[in-house]
């Protein structure tokens, strides 16, 4: 259902609701309605529709990685030795189980996957790379880029 929709299906009120909630997902429907210029009931109806139709996938807290001791970020390029469907599915299933992998994207180009890995420090990253990522099904090669500073990190 969610894949059949485009932003063309949304009017300016819907887009304002999405923008407001992407900035503060905890705001009440009353606060949201005031911010987007609708009364409470129509705003609540639109919000429910946006959730039901898959435009809003969920609500979550944005955590402070530094306070949690996981502010080391590395991006790992991963090349597979086998890219047939079964091998890709096995890799996808296994990589989802690694808690340090914050994001995993299949990429077209010189490598097959790009992983965003969050750990406490470079030693912990090296352990995750050596013991977990390199052991994933069909992994033949990895290359790492260590983040010096995160300039912008947001969802959509």
From Swiss-Prot:
Q: Which InterPro entries match?
A: ArsR-like_HTH, AsnC-type_HTH_dom, Dimeric_a/b-barrel, Tscrpt_reg_AsnC-like, Tscrpt_reg_AsnC/Lrp_C, Tscrpt_reg_HTH_AsnC-type_CS, WH-like_DNA-bd_sf, WH_DNA-bd_sf
The record's section on SMART domains has: HTH_ASNC
Is Transcription a UniProt keyword of this protein? yes
**A Pfam family it matches:** AsnC_trans_reg
* Any one Gene Ontology cellular component term annotated for this protein: cytosol
Record-level Gene Ontology MF annotations = sequence-specific DNA binding
Q: Which GO terms describe its biological process?
A: alanine catabolic process; response to L-leucine
Which top-level group of life is the source organism from?
A: Bacteria
Q: Which Gene3D superfamilies match?
A: 3.30.70.920, Winged helix-like DNA-binding domain superfamily/Winged helix DNA-binding domain
- What are the residue boundaries of the HTH asnC-type domain, all occurrences included? 10-71
What keywords are assigned to this protein?
Answer: Activator, DNA-binding, Plasmid, Transcription, Transcription regulation
Q: Which residues bind DNA?
A: 29-48
Main role?
Transcriptional activator of the putA gene in response to proline.
The protein's matches in PANTHER family, at most eight in alphabetical order, are given as: LEUCINE-RESPONSIVE REGULATORY PROTEIN (PTHR30154:SF0)
Query: What protein name does the entry list?
Result: Proline dehydrogenase transcriptional activator
Q: State the organism of origin.
A: Rhizobium radiobacter
């Amino acid at each position: 259902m969610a894949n059949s929709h485009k932003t063309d299906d949304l009017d300016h009120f819907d887009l304002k609701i999405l923008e407001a909630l992407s900035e503060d997902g905890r705001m009440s429907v009353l606060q949201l309605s005031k911010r987007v210029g609708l009364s409470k009931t129509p705003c609540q109806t639109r919000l429910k529709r946006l959730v039901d139709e898959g435009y809003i996938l969920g609500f979550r807290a944005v955590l402070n990685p530094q306070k949690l001791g996981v502010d080391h970020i590395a991006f790992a390029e991963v090349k597979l030795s086998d890219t047939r469907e079964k091998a890709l599915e096995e890799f996808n299933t296994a990589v989802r189980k690694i808690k340090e992998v914050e994001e995993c994207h299949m990429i077209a180009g010189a490598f097959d996957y790009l992983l965003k890995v969050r750990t406490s420090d470079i030693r912990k990253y090296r352990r995750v790379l050596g013991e977990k990522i390199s052991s994933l099904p069909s992994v033949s090669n990895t290359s790492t880029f260590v983040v010096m500073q995160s300039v912008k990190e947001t969802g959509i």
